Every structure is written in structure tokens, then in C-alpha cells.
Amino acid sequence: MQTNIYLVTDNRTPKRKDCSYGYLMEAVDMGNRIGTAKNWRGCEEDRYGALLRALVEASGRMKPNHAGTSTVLIVTDCQPLASGVLSLKRWEQDGWIRSKGRPVKRKEEWKRVADALRGYQIAAQVKGVDFYEDLLRKGEYDGER
């Protein structure tokens, strides 16, 4: 089984401002969508922070995976966030210190993500997600694409 998590925000800048963020989740088993979840809400945050909030909320909905056979695919248009997702295990092993010896920024949020996704095989993909943002903003997502 695979869970796809699409992370979106309407904040296109690195500046903190009033914005909205959200996620779409879909559970897929053997090519069939078997469940969906979504959320869209406001905050005051920069782009990265808004997307990280979406990731924290979405990953918090995941059930524990003790078998280690399920995959989670995080889809975002933010390369730094995708890199963070792929660095989770290393950061945790290194005491939440990045490769150049600096502490991981927003460590508490990343710890929550790591705890929620423990046991899953994690992948990240950088691609446009505007389609999902539009659906969330309009409240039209019903699990169909």
C-alpha cells in the first residue's frame, strides 16, 4: 500500500505573511484509491513553514506501520522541503544536526514528522501541485482527479 501526500500553500515567497496551506492524502492499494483526506486552513507563515505545517498535520494522520512494508510519497513543489523529508533518518541519527554541523531548523516540527512516519518507506517528489491547491481552495476535492 502507498499513501500519497500532496502539500500546497498559496504563499509563494520566503517572507512570513498571512496565507493558507493544506494537504491532500490518498491511500492507494494495487492501483485503487481506497481512502482520502484533506485540509485547508490559514496561518501566518513563510512558504517553507506553511508547507511544513501541512506535512506535520498530514503525517499526524498516518497510522503506525510496524511491518515496514508501506510507502509514503510526499509531493511538493518546494525542493528544500523534499530534501528535508529525505534527510529525516540521517538528522535523527545525528542528533538533529545537519551535515555541515548546524542544527536542523524547526526541529520540533521535523521530529513530529519523523515520529509519525517511522516504519514507513519514505519518498519525496518535487513537481507542480497547483492543481491540488485549486481544488482545496475551492473545496471541490472529492477524491477524484
PLM region spans:
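Loop-to-helix element that buttresses phosphate recognition and phosphoryl-transfer chemistry
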Residues: 50, 54
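Accessory terminal regions of nucleic-acid processing enzymes
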Residues: 142-145
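RNase H catalytic domain
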Residues: 59-138
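RNase H-like nuclease fold core
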Residues: 1-49, 60-61
